[in-house]
């Protein structure tokens, strides 16, 4: 897979990031590589997107975690958690476009990805399938 761009955020390391999307993240900018500019046609303010990211700082060897790093919770297989540490650390983030410009920079609300996170894809969010 080839990233199409990167996230630009005030979140500088994993410890700064919310553990879940519903905990809120800061506004961020999706910096898309210029060669993909035509693919942004009709992505406008108000568009809801699913941002697919590669969680590049994740530990791909981890198979079990204490959910939310709470050792009072029993070790749980990563496929039964939302942990970013997993064999294939793909992130899915539902966001709304809040601004655009220059042509390959898109401003979005509440994105819980750290600065420099590679973006793999953008997909329009479907209201009838909230997580698709």
Task: Please place each PLM-identified region on the residue numbering.
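Glycine-rich, low-complexity intrinsically disordered segments
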Residues: 1-94, 98-132
């Amino acid at each position: 897979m080839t990233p199409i761009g990167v996230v630009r955020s005030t979140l500088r390391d994993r410890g700064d990031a919310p553990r879940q999307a519903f905990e809120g993240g800061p506004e961020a900018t999706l910096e898309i590589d210029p060669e993909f500019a035509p693919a942004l046609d009709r992505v406008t303010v108000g568009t809801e997107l699913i941002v697919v990211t590669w969680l590049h700082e994740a530990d791909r060897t981890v198979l079990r975690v204490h959910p939310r790093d709470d050792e009072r919770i029993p070790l749980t297989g990563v496929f039964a958690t939302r942990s970013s540490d997993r064999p294939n650390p793909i992130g899915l983030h539902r966001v709304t476009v809040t601004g655009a410009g220059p042509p390959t920079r898109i401003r979005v609300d509440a994105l819980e990805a750290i600065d420099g996170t590679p973006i793999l894809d953008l997909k329009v969010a479907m209201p009838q399938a909230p997580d698709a």
